[in-house]
UniProtKB/Swiss-Prot annotation:
HEAT repeats lie at residues 4-47, 164-203, 816-856, 1166-1204, 1483-1521, 1731-1768. Belongs to the MROH1 family. GO terms for cellular component: cytoplasm; lysosomal membrane. Keywords: Lysosome, Membrane, Repeat. This is Maestro heat-like repeat-containing protein family member 1 homolog.
Length: 1768
C-alpha cells in the first residue's frame, strides 16, 4: 500500500499489518507483534480478519511463499480459537476453505512451510464437527472420482492428518474416499505421492480401529464366510468385525500398495512396508494365509536397502506378526527363520553403550524389534530359544549381546511361555559359559546378567549349574597383562570392575540361597584362593566359603575336609592358612581391606580344625579380641568428648602387632615341628605371589620371620632367611622394612646365627652374579669397583636389619655385642657420607634404633655409649649434603629422630657440639618450602609407630615424664595457663590437627615435629643459659624472614626451647640474682611481632616474651615461684590478641604494643637499654608494615619514658628517625609513629620547618603530609600557622592567574603557584588542627578565601612547564595535574577537610547527594555547587552564615568580577532562608541579600544577571510574608524581563525566568496573575516542544503552577489545558527523567480542572503525590479510556492532536503517540467512532508501521492498531 493513500477502515488496517509483517519478515520482534495484534483483532472481529486475509492473498498473487505462509498461519490461529468458532460466518469459512485448498495446490515441492500452513488451516477447521464435512468436501473436490492423476500431495496428507485428529469425522467419508482411491493408486508413480498415500492409508486403518475401540457396539458384525479378525497379538480381545465394511476396498488397496515395496526410493519402501503391515490387520484371514510367503519374501529384504526406514519396516513386520500369531491357521513356520534373521540385527543395538550415539528412531526400532520377538514367542517359543542359543555362538560381540539380551527379555517378560524350556536353556548355555569361550567384557557382563535371571528363575539348581559357577569364578578376575597384550585390546578397567562386582554378588547369592551350593562351591573355591590372579578377590572367595560353612553348621552338618581334597588344584591347609594371614595386611587402611580381613579371619575361625586340631582354641581369639580391635581401628571419627582420633599409621602398627601375636600363638600351640616347617615353607612359596603388592609381601615377610622364630632347625632357618633376602624387592621401601623386621623377629631366637648370616649377605656385594639379581658363583672373582643399584638397595636392607637385630638383642648381652661386633662392622658403612640417599636413610634409622636400644631407661646403669659423638658426626655429614629449600627424601626427618635419640645418651653434649648440631639442623630444616611429590603417601610405611618412636619405647617411665616428652610445639591457637600462669600450648588432636608423623601430614610437617623433639632433648640434657643463648643465636635470624613458614617455625622453636629450659633449668640458684642475657634481644625482636600478620606468630611471640620475663624473674633469685606482678598470658591474649586467624584491628594493635611497652619499661634493666634500642631500629625496616609500625611505637614509648637519660644521643636519634622516613614511607603508621617522636624537636624550630615545607612540590608526599599533620596538632603552632596562611592566600588572590599565549591568537589562563601552595597547606593543617577554637575564629575568613579562590580559578588550568630562568623549585608537578585535574579541586579538598574537621558530616552528605563536589570543578556548574554548599550551611551550621555574609560585603562593589560573583552567589543562596547565629530568621540579612540581587540585575556579567533572576525566584520559599509582599512584584517583573534578555542566546536566562515564575506565581495575587497569564501562556506553549529538556521540564512545571493558581476560575486556562493535555500525557514518558517528573506533577495538580471524577480517581491512584506511574502503558490505557468517555466531544480533537506527534523527532514520543491513539480509540461506541477523523489517524498509524528509524515505533503502532478492532 502506498504511503500517500488514505486509510479509513479496519480492513485497510489489517491489510497494512499484513503488509508490515511481509515487509519486515526478517525482524522477528515486529513479525511476532503483528501476529499478536492480528490474533487480538481476530478474537473480536474474526470475519473481518478472515476477509482481509482472503483479499490480501487474492490481491497479491506474486507474494512470496514465506509471506503467504504467514497469512495462512494467521488464519489458522484465528479459527483455532474456540471462543470465535460460533461467530464465524459459514460463507466466509467456505471461502477460506477454498482459498486454503487453492493455496495448497499452488505450492511446489520446495514450498514446505506454505503447504503446511495451508494444511494447518484445513486441519484446524476439520477438528470442529461444524466444518469437518465442508473441509472434506472441499478436499474431495480436488480429488474427483475416476481421476487417474493424483491430487496434490498435501491434499493426501491433509486427509491423513484429519484421520489422526478427528477419526470420527473422517470415517463416514472413508468408503467414498477409498472408492476414489482404489482406481487411482495404480496410476500413482512418483515416490513423494506414494509416501503420502501410504501414510494416509495407515492413518485410515488406525482411524477405523480407533472407532472400533470407542464404539464397540458398531463392531459387533462378523465377517461373512471367514474367520474373525483379531485386533491384538495376544488374542485376548473380543473379535470385531466392522473392518469387514472395508475389507474388499482394503484388499484392493493392499494389492497396489504391496507393489510399491519394489520402489527405488527407500522412504517409499518403508512407508509401503508399514502400510502393508497395517493392511494385514484389515484384510481377510484367507487372503493373509495365501500371501504369507509373498509378504515375508518381499518385506524381509527391505532391511538391506533401508537407510533410516528400519523403524517403519519393523512396525510393519510387527503388525504382520500380530495378525499371523493369533492362532495356528497361518502357515508361518517355514518363514520364521527368515523373519528372525531379519529382526535380529535390530535387536543387537545396545542403547546403554555410551560409545555409540543412537538416534531416537534407532532406539524405537530396537524396542519394536524386542516387541516382535515377544509377539512371536507366544506361538514359537521353542524355535526362538534354539535360534538365540545359536546366535550366542557367533564370533561377533554384537550378535552375542543381542541374543543374550533378547533371551533375558523373554525370560523376564514372557515367563509363562519359557517354563517348559528349562533343560533346553541349561544345555544350550554350556558352550557360552565354557572356559574356552573368550568374549569381551561387555558380553561377559551381559552373560552375568543372564545368569542372574537364570538364578531368579531357579535354573542354576538344575543340571549344568556347575558351568554357571565356573563362569562366575573365572570372571572374578580380569585378564593378565600378557593375555591382554596377546589379544591386542585395550583393557576396560571400569568394565572389569563392574564385571567383578557382578560376579562376586552372583556367587554370594548362590552360596547364600542355592540348595546345592555346597555341592557346587565346596571345595571348588579352594582351587582359586591361593592363586596369584585371585589375590584381589580373596575377600569375596572367603565370604562365599564362610557362608557355606556357616550354612552347614547351622544345618547341623559337619564340613567334609576329605572329599575332593585329593584334587591337586585344591590348596592345602598350610597354603590356605598362610594366604589368609597375609590378607590381614593394612586392614584398618580402608573399607575394602577391612572387609577382606574380616572375611579371612572369620574363615580361619570357621575351618580351624582343618588347619590343626589344637588350633581351635587360639582361632577363637579372632571373634574375642581381633575382630573387636578391627572394629575399633576402623572407626575414623571420634566424638567431641572422646579421646582424640588415633593416627592411621599407629592403627596399622597396632593391628599388625596383634595379628603377629595371634600368629605366634597359633604356631605355638602346634607341637609338631614338621607342621611349623610346612607352614614356613608355604609362606616362602607364596612370596612370589606378591611381586606387585609390596605391603602384603612386607607383611608376609614379617609373618615368615615370626614363624621361623618358632623353628629349631637351623639349616631350615638359614635357608628361609636367605629366601627372604632373595625374594624381597630391596628397591621398595616397604619390602626393605618387612625383610628387616622379619630378620629381627628371627634374631630373638637365633641371634648368633643371624649375625653370621648377615655378614655373609654383606659379601654378596663383592661377588659376580651368575643368574638373577642375587645369584653368585663359587670361583674367585675380583671385587667390583662400580656401583650397582641392586646392591645399593640390598645394602640399605642390611643396615636396617642390624638396627632391628640390636633391638631384638637380649639386655644382658647387648652392650658387648654392640661394641665388639655390630659397631665395628657398621663403622665401615657409616663413614662413607657420599652413599646414596636410600642407604643414608637406612643408616640413620639404624643409628636411632641403636640409641633406643641402649638408652639408660632400657638397659639400666650408667653405661656410656662411646660412639655417640661419632654417630652424630655421621648424621651431620649426611645432612650437609641436602638442599635446604627442597625436600626430596626422609633423610632430614630421620636425622632429627636420630639426633633426638643420641643426645639422650651419656655424657651430655658440649656447647660446641650443641652449636654445631643445632646449626646444621636449623640450616637444613627451617627453610624447607617444597617437597617432592609422593613422600606423603609413604609416611606410615617409613615410620612404624609401634616401635619407631623413642618415647613409646620407654612407656614404663613416670606419667609426668612421658607427658613432658610427648608435648609437641605449638601449632594451633589453643591456650591455657599452668599453676604459675605460664602459658601451656597444646595441639588440637584428631579434628584438623596433624600429630607427629601421621600420614595425613606431609613429610615436611613430620620433619618439623621431629626437629622440635631434637631441640627439646638438647635442652633437657644441658638446661643452662649458655645452651639457650646458643640455640637462640641460631633461631634469631629467622624471626624477620619474609617466608611465613620460616617465621612460624622460628618462633615455635623459640617457645619450645624457653619452655623446656624453664622446666629443667639447672643454672638458677635460689637467692642468687643475675641477668638473663637473652632478655633485651628477645624483647626487641619479639615484641613487634605481637602484631604479625599471622595469628600463630603473634601468639607464639607473646608466649616467648612471657617465658622470657618468667626466666628473667627466675634469674633474680626467685626460683620457679609465681611472679605475681607478671601479666597474665591468657588475659593479654583475650584483651589484645583475640582476632582468630586474621590480622589484628588497628586499635587492638596499638593497645597491645602500648601494653607490652609498659611491661618492657618496667622490667628491662637500664644496662640492656642500648641493645634493646638497636634491636628496635633493626625492626623498623621489617618486611611487614605492621611489625615495623609496632617497632616505631615501641621506639616512641622508649624515647618518652627515658628521654632524660638519652641526652647525648638525642641528635643522632632524631637524625636517624628523619632518615628512616624515606625508608618506611610504604608504612603510614610507621611514619606517624616516627613523626610523633619528631614533634617535640620541631616545636623549637617551627618557622624553619614551615619555610622548608612551603617549598615542597605539590602534591605533598606522604612524609610531608604527615609532617604538617603533626605540626597542626600542636596547640601552640596551629593558630600562628593559620594566620600566616590566610594573610598570604588573600594577597595571592589579587593576581590568581596569568594569561599565556597558546599561539594562533589564543590565550589561556594559567593559575599562579602561590595560591595553589597556600590552599594545599591550608587543606592539610585544618584536618586535625588543635585547638578547634582557633579554627572556628578564623572560619568565615577561610571559607570566604576558598570560595573566592574557586570563582577566580574556575576557568584556569595548571601550568604545564616552569618559566624559563626561574630558580625556584618545581612545585606544581605533573602528579598534581593528574591528581587535582583543575585548580579548583584544591579548594574543594580544603573545604572537605575543613568540614571533616568541624564534624559537619551532614554538609558533606548534602554535597555528595547533589554531586556538588564534582560541579565545583566545572566552569558552568560551580555556581550551583557553591549554592548547595551555602544552603547546607544554613541548615546545618547557621552560626557560620552571618559572619560569612558580613565578610563577603566588601566584595560586592569590587572591580574584580570573581569577587562580585562570589558576593552574588552568597546573596542568592540566602534568599530561601536567612538565619541568625541561633538559627532564627534574620530579616535584616535577607533584605540586604535582596537589595544586592536587585542592584546586580544590570551587572555587565550575564552569569551574574542569570543568578540574580534565579535568586529572586527563590523569594517564593522565604519564610517572611512581609518580605515577600514587599519584593514579589519586583521579582516577577525581573523574571518577565528575563524572558526577553537580549544577551541570552542559549535561553539560559529564559529558563531561569520560567523557573522563577513557576515559584513566584504561588505568591502573586490572582489579579496580578490574570494580568500576566495570557502572555505567560503564549510564551510557554512553544517551550513544551523545545529541544532543551531542561526548558521543557520548567515549562511543564510552570504550566502546572499557573493552573493550580488561576485555572479553576479561568476558562481560558481550561481551554489551554485540553489543548495541552496530550502534550502532558506524551511527555509523561519523555526521554529525560526531569521532564517526566514535572509532567507527572502537573497532571496531578491539574486533574481537578478536568471536572471528571473518574479522571481524578485514576490520577490520584496512579500519580499519587505527583509520582510517576508504575507502568506508563497501563496508566495511558486507563486514562485514555476515561478521557474518551468523559469528553466525547473532544475525542476527535485529542486524536488529531496525538496524530500530530506521529512525526516527532523523538522515537519515544512517536511510540507514546501511537500507544495513546490506540488507547483513546479502543472501546468507543459507534456514535463516537463516527466522529473520528479516521483517514488522518489511520493513515498516520500506517505511516508509523513503516517507520525506518526505530523498530519500537513499528511495534507500538502494531499494538495500537490491535485496539482498533471495532472500527469495521
Amino acid at each position: 500500500m502506498a504511503a500517500t493513500s488514505q486509510v479509513s477502515s479496519l480492513l485497510d488496517l489489517i491489510m497494512s499489518l499484513l503488509d508490515t509483517a511481509t515487509t519486515y519478515q526478517h525482524q522477528e520482534s515486529v513479525k511476532n507483534e503483528v501476529a499478536e495484534s492480528l490474533k487480538t483483532i481476530g478474537s473480536h472481529q474474526p470475519n473481518v480478519l478472515l476477509t482481509a486475509c482472503h483479499q490480501y492473498l487474492l490481491q497479491n498473487p506474486k507474494l512470496g511463499a514465506f509471506k503467504r505462509a504467514f497469512v495462512l498461519q494467521t488464519i489458522s490461529i484465528c479459527v483455532d480459537n474456540c471462543e470465535v468458532v460460533s461467530k464465524l460466518d459459514e460463507q466466509i469459512i467456505m471461502l477460506i476453505i477454498n482459498l486454503a485448498t487453492q493455496e495448497m495446490n499452488m505450492t511446489k515441492d520446495t514450498d514446505v512451510e506454505w503447504a503446511e500452513s495451508s494444511m494447518e488451516v484445513l486441519v484446524t477447521l476439520a477438528k470442529n464437527t461444524r466444518f469437518v464435512s465442508h473441509v472434506i468436501d472441499a478436499i474431495l473436490q480436488k480429488f474427483p472420482p475416476g481421476q487417474t492423476t493424483s491430487p496434490h500431495r498435501y491434499i493426501v496428507l491433509t486427509m491423513a492428518t484429519i484421520a489422526v485428529h478427528n477419526p470420527f469425522g473422517l470415517v463416514p467419508f472413508l468408503t467414498d474416499i477409498l472408492s476414489r482411491t482404489v482406481p487411482l493408486l495404480q496410476h500413482v508413480k512418483t515416490d513423494p505421492l506414494r509416501c503420502a498415500w501410504a501414510r494416509a492409508i495407515c492413518s485410515f486403518c488406525e482411524a477405523v480401529r480407533e472407532c472400533e475401540t470407542e464404539r464397540p457396539k458398531e463392531a459387533s458384525e462378523e465377517y461373512i464366510g471367514d474367520h474373525s479378525r483379531p485386533n491384538s497379538a495376544s488374542g485376548h480381545c473380543q473379535e470385531v468385525s466392522n473392518r469387514a465394511t472395508y475389507s474388499d476396498q482394503t484388499e484392493a488397496v493392499y494389492d497396489v500398495i504391496f507393489s510399491w515395496i519394489y520402489s527405488k526410493d527407500p522412504k517409499t519402501r518403508g512407508e509401503a512396508a508399514e502400510c502393508v503391515g497395517e493392511l494385514c490387520l484389515m484384510i481377510k484371514q484367507t487372503r493373509l494365509v495365501e500371501d504369507v510367503k509373498k509378504i515375508v519374501t518381499n518385506m524381509i529384504p527391505l532391511y538391506r536397502k533401508s537407510y533410516n526406514e528400519s523403524h517403519m519396516i519393523t512396525q510393519g513386520i510387527c503388525r504382520f506378526l500380530e495378525a499371523a500369531c493369533v492362532d495356528e491357521t497361518c502357515p508361518l513356520e517355514p518363514y520364521l527363520e527368515d523373519i528372525l534373521n531379519a529382526l535380529f540385527p535390530n535387536a543387537c543395538l545396545d542403547p546403554d553403550d555410551t560409545t555409540v550415539t543412537l538416534s531416537t528412531q534407532a532406539i524405537k526400532n530396537h524396542s519394536e524389534a524386542f516387541r516382535c520377538f515377544d509377539v512371536a514367542a507366544t506361538r514359537f517359543a521353542d524355535r526362538i530359544v534354539y535360534y538365540l542359543l545359536h546366535k550366542m555362538q557367533n564370533v561377533a560381540d554384537s550378535q552375542k549381546l543381542g541374543a543374550i539380551n533378547v533371551l533375558r527379555h523373554l525370560l523376564n517378560a514372557t515367563g509363562q511361555h519359557m517354563e517348559d524350556k528349562r533343560s533346553l536353556l541349561t544345555m544350550g548355555l554350556k558352550k557360552l559359559l565354557a572356559a574356552e569361550n573368550t568374549t569381551s567384557i561387555r558380553v561377559k557382563r551381559a552373560i552375568v546378567q543372564l545368569c542372574v535371571a537364570l538364578a531368579d528363575h531357579s535354573y542354576v539348581d538344575a543340571e549344568g549349574g556347575d558351568y554357571v559357577i565356573a563362569f562366575l569364578v573365572r570372571n572374578l578376575v580380569g585378564p593378565t597383562e600378557q593375555e591382554s597384550a596377546a589379544k591386542k585390546v585395550e583393557v576396560d578397567v571400569a568394565g572389569l570392575n563392574q564385571l567383578r562386582t557382578q560376579c562376586a554378588q552372583a556367587l554370594y547369592t548362590i552360596a547364600n540361597t542355592c540348595v546345592c551350593a555346597t555341592k557346587l562351591l565346596w571345595p571348588y573355591l579352594l582351587e582359586f584362593i591361593c592363586c596369584e590372579r585371585y589375590t584381589p578377590v580373596v575377600g569375596d572367595l572367603c565370604k562365599c566359603l564362610r557362608t557355606l560353612v556357616s550354612r552347614e553348621v547351622e544345618a547341623g552338618r559337619k564340613m567334609d575336609y576329605v572329599t575332593g581334597f585329593d584334587n591337586p588344584k585344591v590348596a592345602g591347609r598350610h597354603a590356605v592358612f598362610a594366604r589368609l594371614f597375609t590378607s590381614f595386611c593394612n586392614a584398618p587402611l580402608n573399607g575394602l581391606l577391612t572387609r577382606r580381613a574380616r572375611e579371612a579371619g572369620g574363615l580361619i575361625q570357621a575351618v580351624a580344625p582343618w588347619f590343626h586340631p589344637s588350633m581351635e582354641g587360639p582361632a577363637a581369639r579372632w571373634s574375642e579380641k581381633l575382630e573387636p580391635l578391627l572394629d575399633e581401628l576402623s572407626t575414623t571419627v571420634s566424638s567431641g568428648d572422646s579421646a582424640p582420633a588415633e593416627l592411621r599409621g599407629r592403627k596399622i602398627a597396632r593391628w599388625h602387632e596383634a595379628c603377629l601375636d595371634w600368629l605366634s600363638a597359633c604356631v605355638a600351640v602346634v607341637p609338631e615341628g614338621d607342621w611349623r616347617q610346612d607352614l614356613a615353607a608355604a609362606m616362602g612359596k607364596q612370596l612370589d605371589m606378591y611381586k606387585e603388592l609390596s605391603d602384603e609381601k612386607s607383611f608376609l615377610l614379617r609373618c615368615l620371620g615370626v614363624t621361623l622364630a618358632r623353628i629349631t632347625a637351623k639349616q631350615f632357618v638359614i635357608d628361609h632367611m636367605m629366601l627372604m633376602f632373595k625374594s624381597a624387592s630391596h628397591s621398595v621401601l616397604t619390602e626393605r622394612q618387612g625383610c628387616a623386621r622379619g630378620v629381627g623377629s628371627i634374631a630373638t631366637s637365633h641371634m648368633d646365627l643371624i649375625l653370621i648370616e648377615l655378614e655373609n649377605v654383606s659379601k654378596w656385594e663383592h661377588a659376580r652374579k651368575s643368574s638373577g639379581i642375587f645369584g653368585f658363583i663359587k670361583d674367585t672373582m675380583p671385587i667390583r669397583q662400580y656401583p650397582d643399584i641392586e646392591m645399593i638397595h640390598l645394602r640399605a636392607t642390611l643396615m636396617l636389619c642390624y638396627g632391628h637385630v640390636v633391638m631384638a638383642c637380649s639386655l644382658d648381652t647387648i652392650t658387648q655385642r654392640l661394641q665388639n661386633t655390630i659397631i665395628v662392622f657398621l663403622r665401615n658403612y657409616f663413614a662413607n657420607s657420599k652413599q646414596e640417599t636410600v642407604v643414608r636413610e637406612a643408616m640413620l634409622e639404624t643409628m636411632r634404633l641403636i640409641a633406643t636400644a641402649v638408652h639408660p631407661s632400657r638397659i639400666g646403669g650408667e653405661w656410656k655409649f662411646e660412639a655417640r659423638n661419632e654417630l652424630l658426626a655421621y648424621a651431620k655429614d649426611y645432612l650437609n649434603g641436602e638442599t635446604p629449600e627442597w625436600l626430596t627424601s626422609s633423610l632430614r626427618l630421620l636425622a632429627c629422630k636420630t639426633t633426638a635419640a643420641l643426645v639422650q645418651l651419656e655424657p651430655p653434649l658440649s656447647p660446641a657440639d650443641i652449636e654445631d648440631i643445632g646449626t646444621v639442623l636449623t640450616r637444613q630444616i627451617l627453610p624447607m618450602q617444597r617437597e617432592k611429590s609422593g613422600l606423603k603417601t609413604l609416611a606410615f610405611d617409613i615410620f612404624d609407630y609401634a616401635s619407631s618412636s623413642v618415647f613409646s619405647t620407654f612407656s614404663g617411665s613416670s606419667s609426668s615424664h612421658t607427658n613432658i616428652y610427648m608435648t609437641p610445639p605449638l601449632t594451633a591457637n589453643s591456650v591455657a595457663e599452668g599453676p604459675n600462669g605460664t602459658p601451656i600450648h597444646q595441639r588440637h588432636r584428631g579434628i584438623g590437627g596433624k600429630m607427629e608423623d601421621d600420614e595425613s601430614a606431609t613429610i615436611m610437617d613430620a620433619t618439623m615435629h621431629q626437629y622440635g623433639l631434637a631441640l627439646e632433648q638438647i635442652v633437657r640434657m644441658a638446661p643452662t643459659t649458655q645452651t639457650i643463648m646458643i640455640l637462640l643465636k641460631i633461631l634469631l635470624p629467622y624471626y624477620g624472614k619474609q617466608a611465613d613458614h620460616e617465621r612460624i617455625r622460628a618462633v615455635d622453636m623459640t617457645v619450645l626451647v624457653l619452655r623446656v629450659y624453664y622446666e629443667c633449668a639447672e643454672d638458677i640458684s635460689l637467692g642468687h640474682a643475675s641477668d638473663f642475657e637473652p632478655l633485651s634481644s628477645l624483647l626487641g625482636r619479639l615484641a613487634p611481632r605481637l602484631i604479625d600478620l599471622l595469628a600463630h606468630v603473634r601468639l607464639q611471640a607473646l608466649s616467648a616474651i612471657h617465658w622470657t620475663l618468667r626466666l628473667a624473674y627466675m634469674h633474680k633469685g626467685h626460683g620457679r615461684d609465681a611472679d605475681q606482678s607478671l601479666f597474665s598470658y591468657s588475659g593479654f591474649v583475650e584483651k589484645y590478641l583475640t582476632s582468630g586467624d586474621v590480622k589484628l584491628e588497628g586499635q587492638k594493635e596499638k593497645l597491645a604494643i602500648e601494653a607490652i611497652a609498659q611491661i618492657i619499661e618496667y622490667r628491662l634493666p637500664q644496662s640492656q637499654m642500648q641493645i634493646y634500642l638497636s634491636a628496635i631500629f633493626e625492626m623498623l625496616t621489617d618486611r611487614q608494615s605492621h611489625v615495623s609500625s609496632a617497632a616505631a611505637q615501641l621506639l616512641t614509648y622508649a624515647v618518652m619514658a627515658r628521654g632524660a637519660t638519652l641526652n647525648a644521643e638525642a641528635e643522632i636519634l632524631v637524625t636517624k628517625m628523619v632518615e628512616k622516613l624515606a625508608d618506611i614511607h610504604h608504612c603510614v603508621q610507621t611514619n606517624t609513629d616516627v613523626l610523633a617522636a619528631l614533634v617535640a624537636f620541631a616545636v623549637h624550630q617551627q618557622q624553619a620547618v614551615c619555610d622548608v615545607l612551603f617549598k615542597q612540590p605539590l602534591p605533598y608526599s606522604i612524609n610531608i603530609t604527615d609532617a604538617w599533620e603533626c605540626l597542626s596538632r600542636d596547640k601552640l603552632l596551629f593558630a600562628v600557622i593559620l594566620d600566616h596562611l590566610t594573610e598570604l592566600l588573600g594577597a595571592s588572590l589579587d593576581q590568581p592567574f596569568e594569561l599565556m599565549d597558546s599561539g594562533g591568537g589564543v590565550s589561556a589562563k594559567v593559575v599562579n603557584v602561590e595560591p595553589c601552595t597556600y590552599v594545599a597547606v591550608l587543606a592539610e593543617v585544618v584536618k586535625n588542627g588543635e585547638p578547634e577554637s582557633a579554627l572556628m575564629e578564623r572560619l568565615p575568613l577561610i571559607l570566604t578565601l576558598l570560595i573566592h579562590f574557586i570563582c577566580s580559578v574556575s576557568d584556569t588550568q595548571f601550568p604545564v612547564m616552569q618559566k624559563e630562568g626561574s630558580k625556584n623549585p618545581l612545585i606544581i608537578t605533573p602528579d598534581l595535574r593528574r591528581a587535582a585535574e583543575k585548580p579548583a579541586g584544591m579548594a574543594v579538598a580544603a573545604i572537605k577537610n575543613l568540614l571533616n574537621r568541624t564534624r559537619s558530616n551532614m554538609v558533606i552528605e548534602d554535597m555528595n547527594q547533589a554531586r556538588a563536589w564534582t560541579d565545583c570543578l566545572d566552569k558552568d556548574s560551580f555556581i550551583q555547587a557553591i549554592t548547595v554548599f551555602i544552603r547546607s550551611l544554613v541548615e546545618q551550621r547557621p552560626a557560620w552564615v552571618s559572619p560569612l555574609a558580613k565578610t563577603m560585603e566588601e566584595y560586592a562593589n569590587s572591580e574584580s568580577e570573581p569577587r562580585r560573583l562570589a558576593a552574588v552567589i552568597i546573596a542568592a543562596s540566602l534568599i530561601r532562608r536567612s538565619t541568625s547565629e541561633n538559627g532564627e530568621f534574620n530579616e535584616q540579612l535577607l533584605v540586604k541579600c535582596i537589595r544586592r540581587l536587585e542592584d546586580s540585575l544590570t551587572d555587565p556579567s550575564l552569569r551574574i544577571r542569570k543568578l540574580c533572576v534565579k535568586g529572586l525566584g527563590e523569594l517564593s520559599e522565604c519564610s517572611s510574608t512581609d518580605v515577600i509582599s514587599r519584593f514579589v512584584h519586583m521579582a516577577v517583573e525581573a523574571a518577565m524581563s528575563g524572558l526577553d534578555d537580549h544577551g541570552d542566546r542559549k535561553d539560559t536566562v529564559a529558563i531561569e525566568s520560567i523557573m522563577a515564575l513557576n515559584k513566584l506565581v504561588q505568591l502573586t495575587n490572582n489579579d496580578q496573575l490574570k494580568s500576566i497569564l495570557p502572555l505567560v501562556l503564549l510564551k510557554i506553549r512553544p517551550c513544551f516542544e523545545k529541544d532543551s529538556h531542561t526548558l521543557r521540564a520548567a515549562s511543564f512545571s510552570l504550566f502546572g503552577e499557573l493552573g493550580s493558581r488561576v485555572g479553576e476560575n479561568s476558562e481560558e486556562f481550561r481551554g489551554h489545558l485540553h489543548t495541552n493535555i496530550v502534550s502532558l500525557l506524551l511527555h509523561l514518558n519523555d526521554d529525560f527523567e526531569e521532564v517526566r517528573q514535572n509532567c507527572a506533577n502537573s497532571i496531578y495538580r491539574l486533574h481537578g480542572l478536568l471536572t471528571s471524577p473518574n479522571a481524578s480517581i485514576c490520577i490520584e491512584r496512579e500519580l499519587k503525590d505527583g509520582k510517576q506511574p508504575a507502568s506508563y502503558n497501563l496508566f495511558i490505557k486507563d486514562f485514555a479510556s476515561i478521557l474518551a468517555n468523559s469528553f466525547p466531544d473532544r475525542i476527535n480533537q485529542y486524536a488529531l492532536a496525538t496524530s500530530n506527534y506521529f512525526k516527532s523527532s523523538s522515537a519515544r514520543i512517536r511510540c507514546n503517540a501511537a500507544h495513546l491513539t490506540g488507547c483513546l480509540l479502543d472501546g468507543l461506541t459507534a456514535p463516537l467512532r463516527a466522529t473520528i477523523s479516521r483517514e488522518l489517524v489511520f493513515t498516520g498509524l500506517v505511516a508509523l508501521l513503516k517507520d525506518s528509524e526505530d523498530v519500537n515505533v513499528r511495534i507500538s503502532a502494531t499494538r495500537a492498531i490491535a485496539n482498533l478492532h471495532d472500527f469495521h
